[in-house]
Amino acid sequence: MLPEFTPVNNLTTQMAQQEIATLQKRLTDYGVAYYEEDAPLVEDYIYDAFYARLVLLEAQFPQFVTPDSPTQNVGGAKVKSGLAKVVHPAPMLSLGDVFSLEELQEWDERTTKTLGFQSEYNLELKIDGLAVALTYVDGKLVQASTRGNGSIGEDVTANVKTIRSIPQTLTEPITIEVRGEIYMPKSSFATLNKQREADGLEPFANPRNAAAGSLRQLNVAITKKRELSAFVYYTADPDAIGVTTQSGALERFAALGLPTDDHNRVIATMADIDAYIAEYTSQRERLAYGIDGVVVKVNQLDNQLDLGHTVKIPRWAIAYKFPPEEALTVVRDIEWTVGRTGAVTPTAVMDPVQLAGTTVQRASLHNPDYLNAKDIRIGDTVTLHKAGDIIPEIGQVLLAERPANNQVYDIPTFCPACHSELVHLDGEVALRCINPFCVAQIQEKLTHFASRNAMNIDGMGPRVVSQLLKANYIQDVASIYRLQETQLLSLDKFKEKSVTNLLSAITTSKSNSLERLLFGLGIRMVGAKAARLIAEKFKTLQAIADASVIDIASIAGIGETIALSVVQYFKTPEAKQLLIELQEAGVNQTYLSDVIVDETSFFYGKKIVLTGKLEKGSRTEATKWLQDHGAQVTGSVSAKTDLLIAGEDAGSKLDKANALGVTVWDEQAFIEAQAKEGTDK
């Protein structure tokens, strides 16, 4: 849900400076999640709205524009550890966006005014994928790279060579760099997510994220299995293929054997552009691949040169972004769930509808204020959109369709899980259960503690946590480390192998660095980033527990609100006792990332899993050595695992690694690699 922006004319200089700084940070964080982690935090239209607001403010207050502002840099990912850097011979620019036909008309008028005449345009579908540059020398594919930050990308040559639609040899022995989009066809995306769910893995949010995550793999075998495809649409060296227009370039690309999208169209009027947009707005779901808009390009290449570009975008092209796709549905119920911090969140349960290629029947209503502001009632007909193919959201209530006897929805006053009275804390919009013994909160806290981004205890998901709670085998996070084999074997569907795997994952989690433990404790307002910043500063959990609000708030990126939350947490008797019990269990409470890591190490940046019994030392020692050399040691095998080190009696993890095509080493191979690294690194 977008905030109401203050009109620019009503802003003081100080207010503008503060809002610009906030927007720059927010958009940077969104960009990191989208480009680097392939896990977007918000829908595209929300990002676009914040970005447009930042552009407007920076235009009005140029003294606050900074070199690292998202408006001054090409969107893209930083280079992933383990992938070589590639310097682009010419910058890989982003496209400017417009979101209405009126804005597109304004762009056309500016372009016409600059050129002095009405230009011919080439229209292309905006493929929802990952930008890539392909370099051919004498007709042979020698390098492929991602956009990265626009100047430096990642070398993904080996991965791209597994994509069948990209030729390794052109039909002519020419030397050229071309650019295009790697995407995942809808059918491949559906198959991949079905398999991931069967394997107990989290499905990808959308085909774009799946394509990005698949291309940026260190394990080429994984990329090959993902069935990616590509379209080529640009070269910075048109003379190499003897063309003078964008449409001519597409024809030459096809003649060279390169994959091109054949839906492009050369037009001359805005009416033609409107018709093209209308045509593919209605047809987008029938295409075999995802599109999120239409790209309008000046067709004559010499006119493109005349128009030039800014530091970030070309002036000769613009992307029209499709509005969020909408569907009509009926709200049948409103359910309330309790989170780990006690926040009670409403969710609308609706008649299932097809939206952006998936079936949707639930949408978060966020908090009581949101629910009241929209006046959503059971039985209402509502519009539903899923912009960016990510988060379903109710748009508006169709009041004309509301049943005559439809009553205002009553906000609950008691917790749906423990039936304690709900409260509104000062300054919060959330409805909250403050009962520390609420079973729903305890379940969510334990599930969070074991989650991948916290202590990463593989095999301890919501179902297992629920079983353990019902059996009274665990009560808090410390009790996880007191679990016994006999207890686990008494649970439904637990066999000897699964028990061994879970106990092994619990043991492995003891060696995690402090920031994971701090995040796993589930302190209100302390996310993964804040946990890392605090851990870096104080080094030990006890030092954090002893710190004052002023000490913690002095950390860049940590405000007084977060600092107060941390101090209040560690003042409680329960937290003090928990620290003692975690220490007694042997859980590391020290920040481990002060080791100076050699970024040239083979292990740097790789996700590695250890399994089985090691003869030349313990798994804990091996884990510490790998972490000191920049590896991320995890407890479970997934498609993102780079290497499995298998000792004696390796079990299901080895089977899964082989099934996923993950590289597997025995202990001797690991020892030899350690020797090559040198003991002084």
Swiss-Prot record:
UniProt cofactor(s): Mg(2+); Mn(2+)
InterPro entries: BRCT_dom (IPR001357), BRCT_dom_sf (IPR036420), DisA/LigA_HHH (IPR041663), DNA_ligase (IPR001679), DNA_ligase_AS (IPR018239), DNA_ligase_CS (IPR033136), DNAligase_adenylation (IPR013839), DNAligase_N (IPR013840)
E.C. no: 6.5.1.2
Biological processes per GO annotation: DNA repair; DNA replication
Binding site for NAD(+): 44-48, 94-95, 124, 147, 181, 297, 321
Keyword check for Signal: no
Example of a GO cellular component annotation carried by this entry: cytosol
Swiss-Prot/TrEMBL keywords: DNA damage, DNA repair, DNA replication, Ligase, Magnesium, Manganese, Metal-binding, NAD, Zinc
Active-site residues per Swiss-Prot or TrEMBL entry: 126
Binding site for Zn(2+): 415, 418, 433, 438
BRCT domain location: 598-681
Gene Ontology molecular functions: DNA binding; DNA ligase (NAD+) activity; metal ion binding
Pfam families attached to this UniProt entry: BRCT (PF00533), DNA_ligase_aden (PF01653), DNA_ligase_OB (PF03120), DNA_ligase_ZBD (PF03119), HHH_2 (PF12826)
Reactions catalysed, as given in the entry: NAD(+) + (deoxyribonucleotide)n-3'-hydroxyl + 5'-phospho-(deoxyribonucleotide)m = (deoxyribonucleotide)n+m + AMP + beta-nicotinamide D-nucleotide
Job description of the protein: DNA ligase that catalyzes the formation of phosphodiester linkages between 5'-phosphoryl and 3'-hydroxyl groups in double-stranded DNA using NAD as a coenzyme and as the energy source for the reaction. It is essential for DNA replication and repair of damaged DNA.
Similarity annotation: Belongs to the NAD-dependent DNA ligase family. LigA subfamily.
Protein name: DNA ligase
Species of origin: Leuconostoc citreum (strain KM20)
